[in-house]
């Protein structure tokens, strides 16, 4: 059930009405039923894999919770207090070891399902290439949203193991947390501790929050249908024929793809957060105007925030303080240099984190290379940080000016566009060849003469509509960057508020890419 389908709109309308009509204590159960219906539309087989993840996560967290409760109760008892210090320590270690076994088995089961379904053919392809083997590929369909809900449940299992959250005893609530349908398509990857207070709560109809939610949904549809799906045809044409469209076309394609991806992804997130807001559920923001970033590190603090914090909290930080890596760093300080040894754990953790980030995005080498290149530029920026700081101190007036900010923002934007070429062409060699032609075969005249751009599946009117849409999106981002929520600003002026969103609704209905004969496009992050 696509977010852009008429069926989904009808599904939401029925859900919203029922949600506030039924007794409030049953609201979360209605959401669970809605999740099952939504997911079943994508295939019942996927429900089986999700159910397995739910059962494993629920059982593991409750077993760990029971073990911890038993440990604490015993140590508080007279028998526990009578133990010697060494005996108490040995008992705690034994209990911790038992919990660790449960924890590891749960991670292996949850991540094993994801790995088997998503990466088996990738492994087979590479084994065949390396050893000239002829292993047949498996015909497995990747369940909808498996990368998102797996990471969500894994974070829950880890947080229980780390004693950050209490285990949820009701398996149906764990099922709702895992399957909450607005988050399934493209996140945000939410934490149990952040979501539980509003996900399972009883909600009264709040006119302001419902209005804000519906406005957010409408804004998401504007981005998706008016901008992203309109630009899709040109991006597909440019990336689909890299031997013909070289030089300036590659540059144009990368910029168009950046606009399409941003409108597509943030549009989907707007719909997600809007749906949750109508239901009274708070979901964290996943984007904070990333194209305003002045460096790559800032960009990744603003883009797909939930993914970045997941990898930072559960991969980067634990790995950087892992005993074996600290030991390796200590050895490097003695044998190579003190500076290198101090940085080694950060370097290794960054590279591993971004390797896994790339692999999470897709089972293909272009995504792996994309991830490693992000790591390279992040570490390169870190190495040049002292030089940058000296330059800023020496030219304080220059770097504080608007022009220098624009320069840094454009530099970061173009760097990210260059890296996304790997996503556009889906082949490492083709991507680098295409990018190389930007420097060896760049010809603006070829791209802008004789109506060349009109041969890419878009008319002049399409380009104009998309351009106006991008300008509106940029203007809204500027207001958000300076004043925060646009909806809060407009809410103080009701007439203007309703006028703006009436015009937005008309724009979606008039200029949106939908309707009879329209091949509805999946959100780009569906594939992940």
Regions flagged by a language model, labelled:
Residues 1-527:
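Membrane-embedded transmembrane alpha-helical bundles that form the catalytic cores
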